[in-house]
Design a protein with these regions (language model features):
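Short Lys/Arg-enriched alpha/beta "domain-start" segment
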Residues: 1-73
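Low-complexity, highly charged intrinsically disordered N-terminal segments
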Residues: 50-144
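Nucleotide-activated chemistry modules centered on ATP-dependent adenylation/adenylyltransferase
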Residues: 1-30, 109-156, 166-474
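Edge beta-strand plus adjacent loop/short-helix module at the start
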Residues: 159-160
Length: 474
């Protein structure tokens, strides 16, 4: 009998997450992987910037989130801590979604050759049986009751990273009078360098800066060494993405839960800017999220429903989901120049002459430089080298850009052809399918004030009609 593709890529018989150890300002637990009778263990650590109260249920779930990045390759996920029915439903859903995202976007639609050639699927292997994984969750269903945590509508938190979306979200929330907690997650890897400029400035100048330190990036490297389909030489080369990990924001959000409870935070703002729903066709009949499930509105809804189901009165939302990246950059640069100066939108930031600067050449950096120039700014203000528009054009043409096609075409036309379209949805505010007005997915107690700010920098409201974005009548 022929072995299925899914069977061939399995690397672990089980992954076990231990009962967590809870400290005054942190948690830790052991992640044990077994394969063929041998076992290896990694101790995962989270340290909070202030004392927090957390029980075994939440602590165990916090430890579980990084592991889900690798569960496509395991038969059993064993949880040695109490969970409730809502927790188990969420984990099973996460496992299925992440399995398909890894299969489609890291193995089939890969941007880098991290996968050993013998494990690249044949055309006949690309089906739902192989994409949805086989992982069974084994856990004690013993957690009872809910947390009865009331959120204060004046208290919001922003997942802060040094990127334009989180900086703009912070600026708008502060301006409209919210008590805004900036939450930083130091995963002890290169991504912290990206956030450090903002973190250092916020710590010196603003109140309510909260942080978690974790060794999760070291855990990722530990796990990558155990996954047999990975080319261990290829994963050491430079890339602007992880070899397998696509389940990043749940790690941050679950780590934030003890702070949500302690500070009665009612809204968590994540930097989901506009993604054109027309740009997401199925892959061989497989519906997927193009590797950004955890930055989708579906994910926000799912987490908000989960919080409600366990008695935490908080929602996960976005203040920038109606607008494209170029508009985010424009508002940040023109309305909040102090925050703009902190922006480091690059996963390969490094030190030069004592300052943290972006690489300037990855697809993310090239997009940011286009946005800044289009908004009338100077990219050198946030650490980019001084290059001509012609050189930027050459670099853009040679790179696989990761922008929605309409936005990329608009930017090229405006910057490189001096031919800006008169009307384009990429400079407007989007009314998504199911909405009657822009911003309806934001909490009602901040919506109108945020939409008012956005409207000052956009070219009107656009609705999707018969597959085209059409300017609404004013």
């Amino acid at each position: 009998m022929t072995t299925s593709y899914l069977e061939r890529v399995i690397s672990f018989d089980s992954i076990r997450i231990s009962k967590p150890t809870i400290l005054e300002n942190g948690i830790r637990g052991d992640i044990t992987i077994t394969s063929g009778g041998s076992a290896k263990t990694f101790r995962l650590i989270y340290t909070y910037s202030e004392p927090v109260a957390v029980d075994e249920r939440i602590a165990g779930l916090i430890l579980t989130m990084p592991v889900i990045n690798f569960t496509y390759f395991v038969r059993e996920l064993r949880l040695d801590f109490p969970v409730g029915a809502a927790d188990l439903d969420l984990i099973r859903h996460f496992l299925k979604v992440n399995a398909r995202e890894v299969f489609v976007n890291k193995i089939c639609r890969r941007r880098y050759e991290f996968i050993r050639k013998e494990y690249i699927p044949a055309e006949s292997d690309i089906n739902s049986s192989n994409s949805d994984g086989m992982t069974e969750v084994i856990a004690p269903l013993s957690a009872q009751g809910s947390y009865e945590v009331r959120g204060d509508k004046k208290n919001s938190a922003v997942l802060s990273s040094g990127g334009k979306e989180s900086l703009l979200s912070y600026g708008m929330l502060k301006e409209i009078g919210e008590r805004t907690f900036s939450f930083f997650f130091n995963e002890s890897g290169g991504h912290w360098i990206t956030a450090k400029t903002s973190y250092d400035y916020f710590s010196r100048n603003f109140r309510d800066v909260i942080k978690v330190w974790s060794n999760v990036d070291r855990f990722y490297k530990f796990m990558q060494r155990q996954v047999k389909i990975l080319d261990q030489f290829a994963v050491t080369r430079w890339a602007d993405t992880y070899p397998l990990q696509l389940f990043i924001f749940p790690v941050y959000i679950f780590a934030l839960i003890p702070f949500l409870i302690k500070h009665s935070i009612s809204s968590v703002f994540i930097g989901d800017e506009f993604d054109d729903p027309r740009e997401m066709p199925e892959f061989h009949g497989l519906k997927h999220y193009y590797g950004i499930f955890d930055q989708s509105l579906d994910f926000n809804r799912l987490m908000s429903e989960y919080f409600r189901s366990i008695g935490i009165d908080s929602v996960l939302t976005s203040a920038v989901y109606p607008i494209s990246g170029n508009v985010v950059e424009k508002i940040l640069l023109q309305r909040y120049p102090e925050l703009f100066s902190l922006q480091r939108s690059c996963h390969s930031c490094h030190y030069e002459n004592g300052k943290i600067v972006p690489c300037g050449r990855c697809s993310k950096c090239l997009g940011i430089q286009m946005f800044i120039k289009a908004a009338g700014g100077n990219p050198t203000a946030i650490g980019y080298e001084s290059i001509s528009t012609e050189e930027l054009h050459r670099r853009v043409l040679s790179e696989r850009m990761r922008l929605d096609s309409d936005e990329l075409s608009f930017m090229k036309s405006k910057l490189f052809d001096n031919n800006e379209p008169e009307v384009s949805h990429v400079t407007g505010m989007h009314i998504l399918p199911g909405e009657k007005n822009p911003g309806e997915l934001m909490p009602d107690y901040v919506r109108d004030k945020i939409v008012e700010i956005l409207s000052k920098y956009t070219s009107g409201n656009f609705s999707l009609i018969n597959g085209e974005w059409v300017l609404s009548e004013q």
